[in-house]
Structures are given as C-alpha cells and as structure tokens.
Amino acid sequence: MRPWVLLRHFGIAFDETLIRLGQPDTKAKILDVTPSGKVPCLVTDAGDAVWESLAIMETLAELHPQHAMWPRDAAARARARSISAEMHAGFADLRQNMPMQIATHAPGIGATPAALFDIARIDAIWTDCLAQSDGPFLFGDFCIADAMYAPVVMRFNSYEPALSETSRAYANRMTQLPAVTAWIDDARKESAR
C-alpha cells in the first residue's frame, strides 16, 4: 500500500504486477522478483529489485528528486525519517491484534492493552507532528511519513479505537486523499474476485 499510494500521489507512472496472496504458487512468483520473498517490491527501470516499503520509498525519493517526498527542511526531514522508521520497525501489537482488512468493520475488536499502548503512541506522534507543521499532513505536505502510516489509518477505520480529535481528523484526511481512495477501491475490487 505505502509505495503505491506515494507513487499515485506524486503522479509517477508505474506498472503494477498483481500476485494473489495465499495461493500455492504465491511464494514462487514473489521469489521470481525478489530474493526476500516478500511484497511489496519495486523493480526499477534498470531492473534492480528493491524490497521493504521504506527502502522502496527512499529509492523513489532519490529517483524523483523533483518531488518533495521528504520534507525539504533538514530537521523536519530527520524527524519524518525517525517516525517512519518507528512505524516500519514497531507497533507489533497493533499489527497482530488489529490486522489490516479493508472490508472489516469491527469496532473494539483487538483492543488489547498492548495494542492500545501502540495506538496511544501513534496518536501522540500524529498530534505532535501536526501541531508543529500546522498540517494538513504530518509535515505540512503529504510525504513518505504519511504513506508509512496509511495502513494504520486503514486499521483505525476498521477497528475505530479512541483517538484524539486531531488524530481522527488526520485519519479522515488521509482516507479522503485521492491516492488512498484509489488504493481502497482497487483493494475492494481485488477482494471481490
């Protein structure tokens, strides 16, 4: 989801190869593209495979420097990278207890103490970033940090945990972002197959 949303938001053309998960040949198809055996994976025009969302988006920022995929300000960029890395490496309890399922609407399900701890930390990150940037996104304009938290927004839409007013408004803005709505529409179509 993350690199897809970033590419769409910045209007960068790409070819998508859909590999259905949970099929007998899924792993083999993925291994044909990336040695990690995981998705997503970006294959550059030079034929190089880049996997892991954050590495993909760093590569995209390098390949397309005309787009401010990271904040231009050095201090803001460092903070954006920090919260992106925290998202990449953390929040395991949220991921485990509130899996991302676009079609799910299950308020309150998965609200374990550990998941709620993760949610409180995310709420604090968003609130702090939005206060410092004056929004509408975490660092003013949409950037990689916002893309990193897009799957969390989907979880919050499904499970509806209690959030601050600031974070709920941010989640709503993210959900309404054209690139995110396009991803949701495609995900729903794919789920219906």
Model-identified regions with their sequence ranges:
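GST-like domain detector, emphasizing the conserved glutathione-binding G-site
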Residues: 1-110
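A local structural micro-motif
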Residues: 15, 38, 164, 182-183
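Active-site-flanking alpha-helical
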Residues: 61, 152-153, 184
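Residue-level signal for well-ordered alpha-helical positions
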Residues: 63, 83, 159, 186-187
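Short, hydrophobic secondary-structure boundary micro-motifs
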Residues: 67-72, 95-97, 135-139, 181-186
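GST-like fold's C-terminal all-alpha helical module
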Residues: 87-176
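Long hydrophobic alpha-helical segments typical of transmembrane helices together
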Residues: 166-193
